[in-house]
């Protein structure tokens, strides 16, 4: 049994021991700036927090995404206030038309606050946008896990299932 790397490298969790090995969150100021970018495009993301819950306020995401979150979804009146009280690991909108996400993804990339992944979604149809802290990715999470466990492999084999795995698969 090996730990799971989750939220595109933002979280590594050992389910066997029920222990978080590491997590990388946004600063509270980054949360505000990222939300401003989403709002400027008329979008409201879901926020994945370090407390294992997902927060949303009238989220712009697919019905399937909300159903998949299930009872871990907490609806709030104000994402700005919520983002100042929690450690946010990931902003997410899944299963939407490309035209809804292309420009916000570019603005997030240009901001220097975030590492957005925009990809064709095979599960929820349409396209999905996940946003990790700057310089955080599935590959950086793998490298961080290797350092955390003092593991020095001669090579690493990875398996991907979505467009947000491409960077990891090219290493």
Regions found by a protein language model. Give the residues of each.
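Conserved acidic, metal-coordinating active-site core of Asp-based
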Residues: 37, 41-43, 48-159, 163-168
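Active-site phosphate-binding/coordination module
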Residues: 1-65
């Amino acid at each position: 049994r090996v730990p799971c790397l989750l939220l595109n490298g933002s979280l590594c969790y050992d389910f066997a021991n029920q222990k978080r090995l590491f997590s990388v969150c946004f600063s509270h100021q980054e949360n505000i700036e990222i939300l401003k970018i989403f709002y400027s495009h008329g979008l409201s993301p879901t926020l994945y927090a370090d407390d294992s819950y997902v927060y949303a306020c009238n989220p712009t995401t697919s019905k399937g995404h909300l159903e998949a979150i299930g009872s871990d979804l907490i609806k709030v009146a104000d994402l700005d206030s919520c983002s100042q009280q929690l450690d946010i690991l990931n902003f997410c909108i899944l299963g939407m038309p490309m035209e809804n996400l292309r420009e916000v993804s570019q603005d997030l990339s240009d901001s220097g606050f975030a590492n957005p992944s925009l990809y064709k979604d095979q599960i929820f149809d349409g396209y999905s946008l996940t946003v990790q802290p700057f310089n955080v990715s599935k590959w950086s999470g793998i490298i961080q896990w290797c350092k955390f466990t003092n593991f020095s492999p001669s090579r690493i084999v990875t398996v991907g299932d979505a467009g947000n795995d491409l960077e990891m698969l090219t290493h």
